[in-house]
Amino acid sequence: MRLAVTIIVLLGALPAQSRTVRVAVCQILSIDGDREGNFRRVEYALEDARAAHADIAAFPESAILGWENPDSHRMATPIPGADSDRLAALARKYGLMISIGVDEKDGDKLYDSAILVDKTGKILWKHRKLNVLAWLMAPPYSEGRPEDIGVVETAFGRIGLVICADTFVDQVAKRVEQLAPDLMLVPYGWAATVDKWPEHAKELEKLVAKRAAQWKCPVVGTDVIGVMTHGPWKGQTYGGASVVVDSSGRVIHILRDRDVEVRTVTLELGRAVR
């Protein structure tokens, strides 16, 4: 798989000194197909994030329609489009940067996407998942393009997005490493059968820690709460236990096991030197 670097510069280069950012890890409940309820739960989390003086609110994968939900083929909207417009309005209302997984319709294709929206409501970046686990839904998500992996310069530094199973792929992880982000925000839909929890959370913890150490930057891996309702993994549980790891690969926060939580953490940005 041939990968190329994509970097978009929106603001001037930031000074090299240490800087911090407050990230609200928004481990919300997402119910498949419940667009209005899921938007309501997103807004509840944003209320908590603003009250905690967060700068960024980080949400899970497919937070609006649910992951691997075949109904998304008819329900999803383009980006930009109705769902991303609503998220932009929420970013403006709460004065927060938002990263969130949003299923995206583009013609007859459905993408498992994530967007980064600044506090003015501008979409700074969109990532389409590459490692889509095609056997879980028919028709499956379309794959993103490797050449579109990138980072974006923001008021907080260079921020990148990948999605869940993208972090399994060493070639994707290597390209992220080459992009030298200051912060990676990774929406997850980390599912397993009920008997595998809470042990399954340890696998998420190890994976996020591995990539943070490789990328030499903090990584926020935000998982969702809920249950899969379609496909071969029907009935599997999203168990939360979202993970925050510092630039050395040290796990510094793990959110609640199988329960909703919004936790705001202060992260020191900048590349680790090792």
Predicted feature residues:
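Bacterial N-terminal signal peptides
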Residues: 4-13
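Active-site catalytic loop in hydrolytic enzyme cores
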Residues: 89, 105-183, 187-188, 193-210, ...
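Residue-level recognition of beta-strand->loop/alpha-helix junctions
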Residues: 27-29, 60, 128, 223
